Amino acid sequence: MARRLRKKRIAVILLTFTALIGWTTHSCVSRCTSSDKEKSADSLPAVHINDSITNALTEGKAYQEMDSVIERYLKRWEINGAQLVITRNDSLLYARGFGWADKERGIRMEPNMLMRFASVSKLITAAGIMKLVEMKKLRMGDKVFGQKGILCDTTYNNSIRDQRYYNITVEQLLRHQAGFNNYAGDPVSSTRYIMMQNHLTTPPDHPTLLRILLKRHLGYTPGEGKCYSNLGYMILSMIVEKKSGMKYENFIQKYVLQPAGCFDMHIAGTYYKDRRPNETKYYMHQGSIPVYEYNNSGRMVEKCYGDTDLPRLSGAGAWCGSAAELSRFIASIDGMPHVKDILSRKSVQFMTQEQPDHQYSIGWNYTPKSNRPWIRTGSLAGTSALILKYPDGQCWILITNTSTWKGHGFSNDTMAFFEKLRKKYM
């Protein structure tokens, strides 16, 4: 009886919160569903979610019980700061920041602050690829390398030793089936070692890095295996630039994020001094040790500020933004009728089609069609991100500004924690 009353009370609270911020959600929806369908995204007024969503919307005794449960969970994992956003049927129900955005400067976390997305960035890149397909600039079966391939530069072709590279397709890159492996470490985040091995004095840009990596043999025949690959999504970022004629970040912002109502997402910087306005500070877990700076300077740095060259991760893991805006992006690619999608129904279905043998979906980790949620995770030094899109219409998003000793395994514990919260409060 007490549990039913608790769920009812939270439901009323969340409905009140939705009504309170309804003008924000409605404004963002109107941007995508204007009766004047001939208007371009550029001609419509920009409504910035990050200017509207703050902790003040959920302050008060009514929220204290659920807030306290979440705070205890974050404290157990020694998380300095986090954002949790919950939507139902694409309507924002709950958005809250916990802990510190920058502890040393005394800045509390708000749900509108920017944090690194890590591999959640792959979902954004995948949406960009699908947009290029809809624009007739690209096909899933297009070959990536070779004289008739997308990246047909002779310097790439001259680097290739393994002829199987010529069979790699766009879809195989999206599904982590292109033949790449990480036996020698993740090549996209191994800049220092690649510099030493190839006698480079500066970190390689994307074309230089790709020419170096194409000399390696593939780990398996494209399409006949799977291995999670940041390199594959770095190459997809290069494909976006080649086919659009624009910088990757600019294309994604103009044709994917802004039409979805997301105006404050960016490629993140590597160092604390490079942070965006309203971006949080990042923290390592207790016991972590300094590492060599990615650029082979010989300096020892905190892993979250210099181990990886963030901009070079590009579409594999470099985006940053708020959990609030990220929820808008998810609402715009989920196939639900409440918010107009930025992609066609066919594209959304293709991205989320359940795959056999636990194969990867397009952009998502997995999109099962049973009673289990769609999953997208992300993990970098200093951050963790998790998206769970449930069959009942709920979407839960958690982003932290702190690493845990468990690395990407932290997401598994958070999934179980979300289930407990859903049973108790939803």
Where are these regions (language model features)?
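N-terminal Sec-pathway targeting helices
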Residues: 2-15
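Hydrophobic (often cysteine-bearing) scaffold residues that line and stabilize catalytic clefts
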Residues: 62, 66, 117, 121, ...
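Short, surface-exposed loop or secondary-structure junction motifs
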Residues: 158-373
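Residue-level signature of the cytosolic catalytic core of signaling kinases
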Residues: 58, 62, 66, 113, ...
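Short, solvent-exposed loop/turn elements at domain surfaces
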Residues: 95, 107, 181-184
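Catalytic loop of the DD-peptidase/beta-lactamase superfamily, centered on the K-T-G motif
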Residues: 2, 22-96, 253-254, 295-426
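Short active-site loop at a secondary-structure junction
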Residues: 76-83, 105-172, 220-231, 314, ...
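Hydrophobic membrane-insertion alpha-helices, especially the h-region
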Residues: 14-22
